[in-house]
């Protein structure tokens, strides 16, 4: 079959090119039919190649049912022409980081059945209100960070408009702090929610509000304050909450009021140690899963604001939990400082269907938990033992007997040594291995090359301070094709540019590379990565979507020349030390507005410390080719960045 090749050059200016004339011979209807199979980001990429395809894309965008772009924040000037003509849009998923209230009329329309808007910091409650008034047939709604910008707010009326108007909602995720806008007694407004709701996720709400929502007060003759179970949310199967403090009362209310619950994820981050009457105890755990349908449970107490734990839960509470959770498939427990091996072991030996087991900060968890794991019928695929300081290699050797392990998170287990790597190197399905802070050596990591490295997709050795360049030369010697996509080499004091040369030379298609706080990494590493050709027909550095160079000691303004286009065309997140040269950093951010430049040491990407995400209802779209950004941005900004560099060079000359 003959193929038609579009040959384009000059940043998309293809007048007179042979490829465009060939495309003109094809019926527009044929091209448009093919384009209906593509997502919006791909359509925009096509539109940047030639006039024929741009014309077809323009027509397709008037009737495409789905508009999903999460990898870049679009401006109002870009969104308006893309969305305005489309009256058949049913699903809108967008990063609104550069939009505000002026975009409400463009975004909100009656035809929508799914809305997922992230980074809505510059929107007020008007966005929520308008969705309730216009989107009567909405099935899925996810709103993130609404009104977080100073001066924006959300009223109770806005939430009432939403819950009254969207009477067919099945999925509702309000990922912002509701407690800032609702009074203590306002939790009952959720009584207006659709009875079709099966998935509810709230960014933050007080335990008191949640308890009020799930209980109702009946007034009768002799018993004027009898509290009964509410029928609100009775069809909810998945509930994810962040509350001020997890208490027995809220756990009891959830268990008794949600008879259909399958998945419960609740966490808190108290500002101080809770009092006994307002904390979770053994009796609270006894209330979990009253209806016996729960398959997935996550109870996390974070130390984000204060070093506090579930101090009133003991091994007895774990015995209660194990008795009620025999059919559990996923269990995640964090902050249970009084629970010992006996408690955790009871969970493992009671839940025969368990496939995912996570313990965050288990200070009393030791190797004995896994001593006789072979006596169970467990088939674990995901295990996380983060910050369990008493674990040693012996525990991992026992755990590795489960050959179905795909994800192993051992971050903060500082007593693990090379014997751990010997054990995990024989796991044929292992895709994720996180070893932050472990006491491992170059020799230990070389064991991975003997087996598991071919399947490994993500590897983190952050803070493993014994490591040198040698392990990089061993792993990336080019002798085999690697599946590795994510690599965290942060806080390795002995890592130098030579290690990055080995990585670049191997051509490994890394999409996420973290080098923060590597003091010996400098400009040479950036140049090597920028010059990498992952595939023969790709642009240099084409695979990297995230690059974190924060606090790398050798980075100077020279690196910024290699961070401009055409280098790193897929880069969406960049971490850098702002003090290198603030003017050049600002110029780079203006030149590449869709590149999120972080200068304050924030962790990049969406992988939070506690893995609090909504990947199940968000469609994560892979970073597209640079044509998308090119189509949106054009050629603006080159001169501005060059001027900043020239000024910097002049200042340096004057100082000399």
Curated annotation (Swiss-Prot):
Where do the segments described as Disordered lie?
632-656
- InterPro entries xrefs: F-box-like_dom_sf, F-box_dom, Leu-rich_rpt_Cys-con_subtyp, LRR_dom_sf
Q: Where are the LRR repeats?
A: 71-96, 120-145, 151-176, 194-221, 243-268, 277-301, 310-335, 336-361, 362-387, 388-412, 413-437, 439-463, 464-491, 492-517, 518-551, 552-578
For the F-box domain, which residue ranges apply? 20-66
Tagged with keyword Membrane: no
Keywords, A to Z, come to: Leucine-rich repeat, Repeat
Which PROSITE patterns does this UniProt record tie to the protein?
A: FBOX
Repeat among the record's keywords?
Answer: yes
Q: What protein am I looking at? A: F-box/LRR-repeat protein 10
Give the originating organism. Arabidopsis thaliana
């Amino acid at each position: 079959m003959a193929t038609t090749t579009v040959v384009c050059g000059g940043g998309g200016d293809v007048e007179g090119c042979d490829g465009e004339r060939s495309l003109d011979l094809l019926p527009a209807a044929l091209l448009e039919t093919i384009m209906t199979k593509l997502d919006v980001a791909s359509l925009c990429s096509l539109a940047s190649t030639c006039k024929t395809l741009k014309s077809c894309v323009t027509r397709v965008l008037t009737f495409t049912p789905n508009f999903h772009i999460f990898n870049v924040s679009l401006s109002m000037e870009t969104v308006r022409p893309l969305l305005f003509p489309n009256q058949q849009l049913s699903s809108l998923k967008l990063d609104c980081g550069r939009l505000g209230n002026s975009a409400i009329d463009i975004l909100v329309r009656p035809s929508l059945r799914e809305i997922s808007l992230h980074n809505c910091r510059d929107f007020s409650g008007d966005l929520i209100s308008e969705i309730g008034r216009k989107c009567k047939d909405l099935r899925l709604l996810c709103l993130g960070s609404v009104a977080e910008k100073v001066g924006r707010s959300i009223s109770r009326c806005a939430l009432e408009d939403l819950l009254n108007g969207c009477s067919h909602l099945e999925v509702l995720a309000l990922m912002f702090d509701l407690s800032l806008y609702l009074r203590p007694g306002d939790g009952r407004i959720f009584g207006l929610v659709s009875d079709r709701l099966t998935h509810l996720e709230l960014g933050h709400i007080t335990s008191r509000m949640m308890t009020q929502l799930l209980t109702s007060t009946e007034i009768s003759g002799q018993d004027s304050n009898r509290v009964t179970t509410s029928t609100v949310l009775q069809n909810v199967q998945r509930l994810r909450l962040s509350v001020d403090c997890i208490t027995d009362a809220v756990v009891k209310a959830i268990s008794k009021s949600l008879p259909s619950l399958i998945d419960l994820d609740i966490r808190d981050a108290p500002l101080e140690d809770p009092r006994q009457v307002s904390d979770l105890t053994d009796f609270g755990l006894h209330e979990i899963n009253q209806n016996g349908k729960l398959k997935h449970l996550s109870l996390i107490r974070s130390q984000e604001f204060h070093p506090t734990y579930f101090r009133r839960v003991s091994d007895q509470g774990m015995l209660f939990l194990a008795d009620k959770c025999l059919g559990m498939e996923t269990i995640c427990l964090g902050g249970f400082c009084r629970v010992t091996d006996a408690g955790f072991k009871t969970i493992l030996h009671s839940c025969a269907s368990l496939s995912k087991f996570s313990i965050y900060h288990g200070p009393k968890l030791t190797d004995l938990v896994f001593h006789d794991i072979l006596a169970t019928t467990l088939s674990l695929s995901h295990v996380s033992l983060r910050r369990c300081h008493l674990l040693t290699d012996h525990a991992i050797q026992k755990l590795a007997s489960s050959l179905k392990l795909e994800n192993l998170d051992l971050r903060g287990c500082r007593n693990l040594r090379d014997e751990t790597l010997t054990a995990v190197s024989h796991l044929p399905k292992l895709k994720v291995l996180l070893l932050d802070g472990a006491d491992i050596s170059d020799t230990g990591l070389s064991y991975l090359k003997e087996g598991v490295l071919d399947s490994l997709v993500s590897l983190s050795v952050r803070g493993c301070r014994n490591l040198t360049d040698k392990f990089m030369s061993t792993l990336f010697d080019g002798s085999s094709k690697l599946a590795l996509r994510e690599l965290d080499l942060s806080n390795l004091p002995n890592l130098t540019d030579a290690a990055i040369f080995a990585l670049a030379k191997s051509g490994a298609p890394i999409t996420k590379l973290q080098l923060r706080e590597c003091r010996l990494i400098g400009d040479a590493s950036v140049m090597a990565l920028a010059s990498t050709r992952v595939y023969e027909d790709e642009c240099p550095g084409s695979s990297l979507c995230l690059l974190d160079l924060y606090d790398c000691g050798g980075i100077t303004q020279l690196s910024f020349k290699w961070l401009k286009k055409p280098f790193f065309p897929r880069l969406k997140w960049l971490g850098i030390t702002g003090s290198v040269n603030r003017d050049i950093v600002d110029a780079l951010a203006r030149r590449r507005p869709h590149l999120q430049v972080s200068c304050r040491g924030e962790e990049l990407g969406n992988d939070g410390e506690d893995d609090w995400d909504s990947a199940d209802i968000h469609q994560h779209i892979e970073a597209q080719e640079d044509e998308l950004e090119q189509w949106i941005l054009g050629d603006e900004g080159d001169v501005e960045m060059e001027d900043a560099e020239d000024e910097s060079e002049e200042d340096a000359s004057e100082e000399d």
